């Protein structure tokens, strides 16, 4: 939610008049919200996430002259008036895995954890990148995995994380939406560490819940504000290939990891340099 609001402010600075509706996680609200926006006659409607795919496809068919951009979706064959921006989740999670493995090494451990929201392809893309990144710095590292079964169950997220922490590891990558807050809560309780997802979770928590921010080594982030500005700028220039999905990664600055004060505090400088070297290899196509 924080990154989306940042995106709105960034668009306003671009000189675009922006209105928005927060539909939350209740999928029944997506269709009426999209219809209402179509009826108001906006030049362009932005959405985010694959949770609203059914509603988006239906509304796009009902309003064929309305243009839509989804800033973060897995849909591969969108309607002719819909453009999908995808992100290379495996690239940002690759860096997260490297950071996690290096932190584990600092602690004398060769095992890290992963808590996913659900056992689905989009989340498993995070897992694959995480494992590959960890193995890039320690080929013998072990990765313990767990799925919450929900993106909104913080209690279950905490329960799963506690089981992993109690198995003898100290670092968990939480790709679990709101359930990930339960993982962070477990880290605080156990004196362990977390890698966040989607947005800079330490930055989002540092004022309201500093004890939680202090256990977030970094976050695998999607640069939604920047991606929104780039997409709208292209739309204004008539350069958007509607009816297609394009995927962007580290090279396009569409994804990355949070390099903030907590990252500098919780990961040694030599290890941060190693993560940066791996990042440059990804940018170079290695």
PLM regions and their residue ranges:
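A residue-level marker of the well-folded mature domains of exported/periplasmic proteins
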Residues: 1-286
